[in-house]
Amino acid sequence: MINYVAYRKFVTLQNGKRVMFRFLNDQDREELIRLFQDAPEEDLRFLKQNVKDIKLVNSWVDNINYQRVLPLLAINLEANNIIADATLHRGKHAAKHIGEVRIFVSRPFRNLGVGSLMLEEMINLAKKEGLHWLKAEIIADHKKVVKAFRTRGFEARATLEDYFIRKDGVTHDIILMLRPVVKREEAEF
């Protein structure tokens, strides 16, 4: 079992900056709002929710439930600010053994490995939480992201044509990627 309050992991990015991973808590409200408010619209158009909606972000902080959604933050230790957010959304009922991974990295910290490191940590956390599968829905045009997931054991299981629609009405194909967390023979019910 993970101690959600005490959990900390320290990593070094490709540029040498030190970053701490920890879970979202009620003290992170303003920083989380800032992370998304500062992001250009272009960076947010492929997210499933309107993260510019302050009420939505407030609801995440007000209703933290680590058994439902595991929100992992990346904190830049130099500036003490949130630079990335990764969430592990747990399935319910017949899908309770499946977690969906979503990752957002602020533009200044992209291509430095923070997203990949957070993905690796999501895999480790899924193992500790007893999940059997991880899934991700990735925009097909985002080749680097698809490659990063593939490198970490995810397989493309389906391409869903025109599955994602942006606010402006433009549709995009989604690649559904899955990764087993435990081998089938290790799984217990």
Show which residues each predicted segment covers.
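A short beta-loop-alpha structural element at the N-terminal edge
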Residues: 19-32, 180
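Helix-loop element at the rim of GNAT/NAT acetyltransferase active sites that forms part
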Residues: 29, 34-48
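Acetyl-CoA-dependent GNAT
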Residues: 49-107, 180-182
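Glycine-rich phosphate/pyrophosphate-binding loop shared by adenosine-nucleotide-utilizing enzymes
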Residues: 17-19, 79-85, 172
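Conserved acetyl-CoA-binding loop-helix of GNAT-fold acetyltransferases
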Residues: 105, 111-128, 147-151
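Conserved catalytic-core motifs of GNAT/GCN5-like acyltransferases
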Residues: 137-138, 150-172
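C-terminal "cap" of GNAT-fold acetyltransferases
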Residues: 162-189
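Conserved beta-strand-loop-alpha-helix junction that forms the acyl-donor binding cleft
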Residues: 110, 136-146
